[in-house]
Regions:
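Non-catalytic, surface beta->alpha helical segment in thiol-disulfide oxidoreductase systems
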Residues: 240-272
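Structural microenvironment flanking redox-active thiols in thiol-disulfide oxidoreductases
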Residues: 180-219, 232-235
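Active-site lining segments that contact anionic ligands and/or coordinate catalytic metals
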Residues: 162-165, 197-200, 242-243, 251
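Solvent-exposed coil/turn segments that connect beta secondary-structure elements
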Residues: 40-43, 172-173, 208, 251
Length: 272
């Protein structure tokens, strides 16, 4: 049967208080553990889509508590837990919904990995996601990795780059958004000035190793940049959205993540 939203008490009148109540009690009337939903997935999926709509107006704390309620009940059954984790992947992580939230998705990943009911093979995908979700987040130190220059054998490490700021630009010359971003970064006079003054290193990285296609495109990048490739970039970075821009400071601490040229220029200007 379709789920029924909780009745919000009439005494709660302001939108924020009503949304807090709604998200706190969202799963009260929903039969989360019902195995019939495994063959009627559209019902829990629609319930989850509506839940993400309320997430947008509810507080972070209330949202995470409500997710915890859902997972505690779902965790009693391996198939039910995996169904909700898959739905959450679709609407919170893979970008098929109107809200992407790694913070809200991470509890689903942890629940699957912590479950004694789920076998190792079915955990593999979530184990990989956990690695990506817990690396290279805002405020963290950038995970060190090796890169190499076009046609050269010698490998370099990011931690050895000496500059007040490093702009890590992960991109693929075959992707249209990447081509546009490359153009915008290359015509930025303020970035060029920072590079020439030694305050900024722009490290453009192709994440899939030194391919012939990539080698054929390296001439398109500005000569002031460090243009390089790395192996297995998807083990270090979340590459669902390309290009990816990270601004790190002299200690390789991430101060901007999945950012824009405007944000980078603003931070560099503020830190003159």
């Amino acid at each position: 049967r379709p789920y029924q939203l909780p009745d919000i008490p009439d005494s709660l009148v302001t939108p924020d208080v009503r949304s807090e109540y709604l998200i706190a009690h969202y799963w009260d009337n929903f039969d989360i553990e019902n195995r019939a939903y495994l063959d009627a997935r559209e019902i829990p999926e629609q319930a989850f889509v509506d839940f993400t709509s309320i997430m947008r107006i509810a507080s972070r704390e209330s949202t995470l508590k409500s997710i915890d309620i859902l997972l505690k009940r779902a965790s009693s059954d391996e198939d039910i837990l995996l169904m909700y984790a898959d739905i959450a992947d679709k609407y919170l992580y893979s970008g098929e919904g109107h809200l992407v939230s790694e913070e809200a998705y991470l509890p689903f990943v942890k629940a699957v990995l912590d479950s004694k009911k789920v076998d190792k093979l079915r955990k593999l995908r979530y184990s990989y996601q956990y690695d990506v979700l817990t690396k290279n987040q805002l405020g963290m130190e950038l995970t060190d990795f090796e890169y190499k220059l076009p046609g050269k054998e010698k490998k370099f490490r990011v931690e050895k780059l000496k500059a007040p700021f490093v702009l890590l630009y992960i991109n693929d010359p075959e992707c249209d958004d990447c081509s546009l971003t490359t153009l915008r970064l290359s015509v930025s006079q303020s970035l060029l000035k920072e590079v020439r003054e030694g305050r900024l290193v722009i490290l453009s990285v192709y994440p899939d190793g030194e391919t012939d296609e990539w080698l054929g495109s390296v001439e398109k990048y500005p000569k002031e940049w460090v243009v390089a490739s790395m192996e297995n970039g998807d083990r270090y970075f979340d590459l669902r959205i390309m290009p990816a821009l990270y601004l790190v400071d002299k200690d390789k601490k991430i101060i901007l993540r999945n950012t824009s040229l405007e944000e980078v220029e603003k931070i560099l200007k503020e830190n003159k």
